[in-house]
Amino acid sequence: MRRPIRPPTYNDEIRRMTHYAQFLLVMAIVLQGTTSTCAAEQQATPPDSIRAKEGFHVELLRSSQQGEGSWISMTFDPAGRIIIGLDDRGLARLQLNEQNDAATFHPLENTDSLKHVRGVLFAHDSLYVSATNSQAIYRLQDFAGDGQFESQKVIQELPYSSRYGHGTNQMTLGPDDMVYVVVGNDVVFPPSLATNSPYRNHQNDWLLPSSHDAGHDDRVGYIAKIDPEGKSWTIVAGGFRNQVDVAFNQHGEMFTWDADMEWDIGLPWYRPTRLNHVVSGGEYGWRWGTGKWPNWYPDSLPATLDTGLGSPTGLVFGSRSNWPQEYRDALFMADWQLGRILQVKLTAQGATYDAESAIFLEGGPLNVCDMEFGPDGALYFITGGRGSQSGLYRVTWTGEPLASPIATTDDDSRRLRHQLETYHQRIAANEIEFIWQNLGNEDLWIRHAARIALENQPIESWRDRALSASDSIAKRTALLALARIGETADQAAIYDHMVGFQWSKLQSQDRLLPLRTLQVSIARHGLPSEAVQQRLLADLDPLIPDNDFSTNWLLQELLVKLQSSTVLAKSIDLLEQSTTQEEQFQYAKTLSHVSVGWDLDSAKRVVNWLEKSRRYTGGKLVETHWRNLKNDFQAILSSSLQDELAGDWERLSQPLPETMESTQPIRPVVKKWTLEDLVEDASKLLPNQRTKEQGERALAAANCLTCHRIGQRGSFIGPDLTHVGKRLDGRALLESIIDPSRQVDPKYLNTNYLMSDGRLVSGRTVGVSKNQLTIEVDSTTGNTVVIDRVEIEASVPGTRSPMPDGLVDTLTREEILDLIALLRG
């Protein structure tokens, strides 16, 4: 509850001015320092360092030069010229020559107010611009015909409170001639959205919210479609993390490639980068913190293809290429982190698709940001981002002459889904029978389309049927719809159906839908009466343990929420018997909500698991969540049990014995190295040019693994360097080592917060919610503090990297080159 506001007094103002003066003094110290650059001609990765599929030729048309910025988005205008969005601010035009084998750079006037241009699209005689850090979508028009876009209008403000690039992203023209806007998870829905948008009424639907996710709102990444003027905003689908682009195939089906949270690797809520078939009303299950939905939730749609680690950027289908048919049908996906473009083959499977991927081309570095097929049928792509070197490339087919494209037809299942989707925004009371028939369709994607259609119809037109029909998949699907959009008064009827339900006769996978319906109903409307709770417990208690992890997941949560007397013992059994750390973390997370029934034996069994699991590996947050669980378990035990286990808690609170490479002896300074000393040699280095053993010795001598991670070794304090050679060339790697503050990933910058009580809190922001920020104040221990947004008087992001200057001054020239060669490989 917020404090009442009182008028400021004279002393308040003096205190505030004193705090602010102190803050400015600190900032002056923090921000001091300069960076230097070399004026030599800059060179993007040469084509001979790029490996493409047989039959394709890669050309480098232009490398960005000093003053041209880093390029992150692109589109072709009607004249065949390329317009690019710049990483920092502004737009530019790349003019191809007649042979399409070179390009000149021309900045566009009066576009500096467009900050961090993540998306550009030429359509409807306009240039649409997604300026993420300007927090708006713009429509630019060139009425004078001089190519300078004198008209620049904001068509939608989209407030964005993060520095991490999860704002407005790319835009694409859809087959319906509408503009599709791709938005990451740090942006709220626009106020002008259509109230009948297919994606609506979404909630977190967490049965057991984690206290460590407190303050998170229900923002999710989404895809909107807008009319040319930007007046109508329809939310098509949502539940994404940070999908950057969308693309449409020859059937008009939409696809996106969503980003992962690599810090979650090793935890049950980790979701790899994933290709999603995006359909009307699609819910894809991303939520904040530990609340990300698993792929199998009945109220969300599964991934079409998991693609592991990576950093998704541009997407494009080959339908506008002049390449062979298998490439015209393929989806091409750019991976900024791993320096590659994937080729995805999609095969119709009912109302959706199966997918398999292969590497189309890759290089090192090749941080691909965006790509488009040009008027000549060749693929053009740009590299860049985060201030890195940019290049414009062209990929052409060199094989046999091409046959004419093969016409394709739509599939019956997709046509049925499309028919159901017409009712996602349209009331059709006379079509309830048609919708109902498809609620039980064996195809998940058709069932989903039917449920969204049902939810859009007046509830009075189908509620009675949902409650009175005999049991079937259609009825169970309708009850999920009722749990989602019905009133609290409707839920008693849902519970009446669930009580006495023949659970034991259902296969494990068939239990997921009714179990999840119970969860959604309770999450949205609260617990049923005590009598109903007891009847549900009698039905559900015998079902656990099950051989299926997903069934156990839902059952355990429900039994904890319903306060089962047996769930404590059963949960500890599951915890001890599970073979994967992901399953164990999920069972432990749910078990930490059980506050009664603990004795010394059960507490010791959990302590034993904590002792074992503290060595589990994965992303940065594995250790964080282990520590949260330790604290949660300790807090729910009685004071007497805490006293009996005091020695165990003390032992668990001590750091593990050092497992990383030992710190090297202090070495004498060899030289205060500068970029000019080494840039020529570093720029010529090729991956694996020097031996791995030499590089490993240099890595140890520089103590890199004290803060960084390579493979399974090292720390998570700084960026993971495993694939850094896919993003940065030798020159860029040298720059980041010699001058670490020249370009820093915002995730790793410290921020200085002046609080209303005069405190100065400095550290790295590791958690963001609507009301609070979590600040890591000590990167070596992981210690954090939570601050309230309303208490922040001022904040200034640091510009200096936490990585000190001069770390390689104790290395010889050859050792530094060995280190760079290792990182490039």
Predicted features by range, described:
Residues 368, 376, 385, 582, ...:
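C-terminal structured "cap/appendage" subdomains that terminate the fold
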Residues 378, 697-712, 720-723, 729-739, ...:
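C-type cytochrome heme c attachment motif
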Residues 39-423, 662-663, 667, 679, ...:
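Beta-propeller domains with acidic blade repeats across secreted/periplasmic ectodomains
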Residues 372-377, 443-445, 516, 557-564, ...:
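C-terminal substrate/ligand-recognition segments
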Residues 1-20:
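N-terminal secretory signal peptides that target proteins for export/translocation
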Residues 142, 228, 459, 523, ...:
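Sec-exported extracytoplasmic/periplasmic mature domains
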Residues 22-34:
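Bacterial N-terminal signal peptides
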Residues 384, 388, 397-698, 717, ...:
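Long, ordered, helix-rich scaffold segments
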